[in-house]
Amino acid sequence: MSDKYMKNLTFANIAKACEGTYIGDETLLDTTITGAVIDSRQVKEGYLFIPIKGERVDGHKFIPTVFEQGAAIVLSEHELTDSAGPYVLVESTTDAMKKLAAFYRKSLDIKVVGITGSVGKTSTKEMISSVLEQKYSVHKTAGNFNNEIGLPLTIFGIRESHQVAVLEMGISDFGEMHRLSTMSCPDVMVITNIGYCHLEFLGDRDGVLKAKTECFEHMMPDAVAVLNADDDKLATVQTLSLIHISEPTRLRRISY
């Protein structure tokens, strides 16, 4: 399939992945979208538009406009009267977007490198990407699109020609890394360090360690974890109970 299209994201699969109800012309169910965005200004021909309710603006108000711009299908939290195109009715567009990102990632034959840590995530992402680009077609997080909104949008940017995705993941509270790793399912997970960020939610560095290591819950089979052994907290991760894995592991210390 051409990189113009998002592999396996047909209207039917979008509805299934989002656990929503497809409403529209059923002859279009096998139509594959060409992109997915939350910003109505970025909509192009064949795109999926995902309206998000923000603090000041509800993206649903732009649904009529995006169909005029060429959107193929939209998500919606409420039924649309006289819709100009097909849509998938869901309880929460934000949650549906995350489910769709997880489905899309798993449908792709690609290796994913996940990167987290209190500091150094972006620099590490750029260095790893630079090395991998010498041999592979790499898709990487743009800017700091590393949260529960930015990560799915980054995943939606992956195309079939990409061989590796380098995804930055940032959190501020417990449970967030669990949700991010559910979407990204890393084959390699890098933790740069455990610092003092977001202690108002995580309590102390032990809390930061616990929150960051949620990333191991949804790694792919035979995945590899790369931890900074010079970090005193990460150096304590020597039993799998700390990294949410139930079977024995092999730990190897690499120095240079």
Regions found by a protein language model. Give the residues of each.
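N-terminal leader/targeting and accessory segments in enzymes
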Residues: 1-99
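Active-site loop signature of alpha/beta-hydrolase-fold enzymes
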Residues: 81, 197, 251
